[in-house]
Amino acid sequence: MAKPFDVSKFRKSITKSVPGLSSGFRDPDTWISTGNYTLNKLISGDFNKGVPLGKVTVFAGESGAGKSFICAGNLIREAQKQDIFVILIDSENALDEQWLQALDVDTSEEKLMKLNVAMIDDVAKVISDFAKEYKSLYADKEEEDRPKAVSYTHLTLPTKRIV
């Protein structure tokens, strides 16, 4: 009979080789409200929670459905209320400063970094570079001493097949 796999050595070596890596489950402890109690309840099971920080959340839908209002407006504003720094990556160059300010989003450089990119590859590079820099600065700090940041990416994806 084969011995059961001893994961303890692997866990120890992998967590040492990747700075900031943790193992096991990590339930979210920070939630960002969508500004809509019904949507919060659908996403999180709680009227006051909304989107979990540290998880990937996608809002998709038809043009005019309110994705930009919910995400660019409400989620960014609510994140800023919790002192969460926002990186806004806009591939459409569709989110203008006056519109965001009208939704009570603080567009100052201390609270928001807006980046305009053209290609999906650029989005991946920006997020990857940010994650590497964040890890290099904060991997050795206790979780409560790390600043919180969130990336909101505004992408247009083709909805029809182009031949």
Indicate where each model-derived feature is located:
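Intrinsic low-complexity, intrinsically disordered segments enriched in polar/basic residues
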Residues: 1, 111, 144-145, 160
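The Walker A/P-loop phosphate-binding site
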Residues: 2-110, 120-136
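Loop/turn-to-beta-strand initiation segments
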Residues: 85, 146-150
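Conserved ATP-binding/catalytic motifs of P-loop helicase motor domains
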Residues: 136-146
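Conserved small/polar residues in nucleotide/adenosyl-binding loops
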Residues: 153-159
